Amino acid sequence: MEASPLFRIPKPIYDTFSPDAEIVIFHGDVKDFIRQVPTGIVRLIITSPPYNLGKEYEDRVSIDEYLHEQASVIRELVRILSDDGSICWQVGNFVEDGEVFPLDILYYPVFKQMGLQLRNRIIWKFGHGLHASR
């Protein structure tokens, strides 16, 4: 009997789009990447967009402007998504004047307008981060 390897040799992981790539992990501005991708070919999109908190890597804008900008990104993601594809959209909270706004609730109408259906909602509760107490 021949022994099988514990882990199979993984498929190559690319950092730029290629029609032959089965796995692409892109780190950067999605708008720079998405223009390269043909319509309807992506089966799974996993992303964690900026939360509009005004961190050093993002500019803080009004929540309406933020959602408008993200809607343009979502529109392009829907364009490249295959008919049997899924989007996993990981977001946190937007905070303004001490009030917490769960971003997933604000995004829901945007996804619905683009014909997508919510299939699952996962809430990760943890005791550290932006709003944790000591």
Language-model features, listed with the residues they occupy:
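Core catalytic lobe of class I
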Residues: 1-134
